[in-house]
C-alpha cells in the first residue's frame, strides 16, 4: 500500500515474487530495462501497446532476447489461460493448492482484468484452487491470464486503501506491485489508513 500511495496510483496489486529461490526466478524487465535475463520459469510480458504475452517455462527458457516493445515481465506463474482456454493440469503446479490469489488477465489490448482472492481465513475465505481462480478470468472474457504472487502477499489497493482482507494481520514487505492510474486524491504515505485489510482474530481460528 505504501508503494501505491507513493506514486498516487488509483489501483495497485501484488506483482512478482522477488524473494524466491534463484531457480524459480525468471527474466525481469521494468520500464524496458533488463534487471535479470536468465529464466527457467514461465513468463508474462506486458507490452507498450497495452497487450500481454505469456510464455510457458520451455518457451521462456529458449528466449535469446525479449521481444521488441516489451516493457515489463513477471515470472511467478503459472499461466492460467492461453488462447481462451484454461491451461491443463494447472492445479498440479507448486502453488496449485487452495491459497489466497492474485492474477492479471487480458480481454483485449488495453482491457485488463485484475483479481485478488482472499484466503487462509477459515471464517471468511479459505482461498482458491488455481483452476477455480482461472475460471474467474474466463468468466470475465479473458483470452490470457497469469497467476501472480498470492498467499500472504496477496493485496489489492484502491485509492490508497486496502480493499481485500489480508491473510495475516502482520504487514508483509511486498517488493513489487502493479500500479495503474494517477490521482492527486490518493492519500500520501504519511496519511492515516481508513481501510487496512485487517480481520477479527477469531476469523482465523478453526474451520467452517
Regions found by a protein language model. Name each.
Residues 1-208:
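Gly/Ser/Thr/Pro-rich low-complexity, intrinsically disordered segments
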Amino acid at each position: 500500500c505504501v508503494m501505491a500511495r507513493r506514486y498516487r496510483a488509483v489501483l495497485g496489486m501484488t506483482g512478482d515474487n522477488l524473494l524466491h529461490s534463484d531457480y524459480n526466478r525468471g527474466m525481469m524487465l521494468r520500464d524496458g530495462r533488463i534487471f535479470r535475463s536468465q529464466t527457467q520459469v514461465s513468463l508474462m510480458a506486458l507490452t507498450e501497446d497495452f497487450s500481454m504475452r505469456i510464455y510457458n517455462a520451455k518457451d521462456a527458457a529458449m528466449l535469446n532476447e525479449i521481444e521488441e516493445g516489451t516493457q515489463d515481465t513477471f515470472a511467478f506463474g503459472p499461466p492460467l489461460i492461453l488462447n481462451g482456454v484454461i491451461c491443463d493440469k494447472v492445479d498440479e503446479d507448486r502453488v496449485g493448492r487452495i491459497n489466497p490469489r492474485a492474477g492479471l488477465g487480458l480481454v483485449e489490448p488495453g482491457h485488463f482484468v485484475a483479481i485478488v482472492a482472499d484466503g487462509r481465513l477459515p471464517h471468511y475465505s479459505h482461498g482458491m484452487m488455481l483452476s477455480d481462480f482461472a475460471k474467474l478470468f474466463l468468466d470475465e472474457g479473458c483470452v490470457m491470464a497469469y497467476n501472480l504472487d498470492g498467499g500472504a502477499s496477496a493485496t489489492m489497493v484502491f485509492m490508497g486503501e486496502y480493499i481485500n482482507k489480508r491473510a495475516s494481520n502482520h504487514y508483509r514487505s511486498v517488493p513489487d506491485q502493479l500500479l495503474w492510474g494517477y490521482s492527486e486524491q490518493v492519500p500520501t504515505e504519511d496519511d492515516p489508513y481508513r481501510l487496512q485489510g485487517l480481520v477479527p482474530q477469531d476469523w482465523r481460528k478453526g474451520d467452517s
